Every structure is written in C-alpha cells, then in structure tokens.
Amino acid sequence: MNWFKIKVQQGKDDYTYAGSSSLSLEQLVDEVAQGKFIRLENLVYLDRGEIKDWNTWDTREVPMVYINPEMIIAIQQFKADPRTLPR
C-alpha cells in the first residue's frame, strides 16, 4: 500500500486529501492523465500537527474517497504510512 497527499481545486478553494492506494505514484499519475477517478482509502487528517484516522473525526462516513482527476492540482507521496512517520 502506498500513501499520498492529493491537493484538489474546488472553485477558489483548494483541499488536501491524504490516504492510501494500491497504485504506485507512476500508476496514479497515469490514471489521472487518462482522466480516471482516483480512489484513496484509509483516509487520515492533520489535527494540530498530529495525523489521525478519519474515523476519529467523522464516524458517519467510510474513510475512502474517489477524486475527480480534473480537480487534481498536486500529488505527493509519503515515504510510508504517515501515522507511523516522525514529525
């Protein structure tokens, strides 16, 4: 499993999603180039400098998202699961 931060543009605002994918960085970029939606699983978020599981913030939703490739402005890969990396 690989971990990524994906920044998207929605109108004037931008948002960042962080989660895992079975795809490599190269495969992910290729999927975006082909206009395919990107799936991130095991979503996490940053709270006061600490990475936390999505479920601790919102238990109503499945911690997974499909991202429209037309909205993606940046993709960055984590070295490992961000919950295990030192600050």
Regions found by a protein language model. Give the residues of each.
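Eukaryotic intrinsically disordered, low-complexity regulatory linkers and tails enriched in Ser/Thr/Pro
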Residues: 1-87
